[in-house]
């Protein structure tokens, strides 16, 4: 072992391999999120019952969550196993363009998920069954 080199811990290696495995599924998870978004928008456009819209909204939320987790895993995998234990190594690696691409994609997906959670969910079917009225904030135009 060369002087100055740190040995990668077993936990860091295991975390790295788990992230590599999750990152390998990113394209599939992103496609699933796009399909879930398309199905949810279609249910909204056709005026499907609220129970159907709510189920599609939940599916979209789960798909966006999975895709976001995979993007962050790809970011950590791009940094490498040394980044799990060494914060300076991780910080330097985060400055590379390859890691920036994954960070941007993960933050884009996270923003989509948060926007969907804040404004995309229809009323819960249980509220409709109980005869509860859901307050809606009127849309305002931004100047």
Please provide the spans of the model-predicted regions.
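Short Lys/Arg-rich cationic patches that frequently serve as NLS/NoLS or arginine-rich RNA/DNA-binding motifs
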Residues: 1-8
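Short, charge/polar-rich alpha-helical segments
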Residues: 8-30, 42, 46
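Non-transmembrane amphipathic alpha-helical segments
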Residues: 29-43, 60-63, 67
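Soluble, cytosolic/nucleoplasmic coiled-coil alpha-helices used as oligomeric scaffolds and tethers
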Residues: 46, 53, 70-73, 77-80, ...
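Short, charged, amphipathic alpha-helical segments
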Residues: 50-59
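Amphipathic alpha-helical coiled-coil segments
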Residues: 58-78, 101-108
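Amphipathic alpha-helical binding modules
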Residues: 82-143
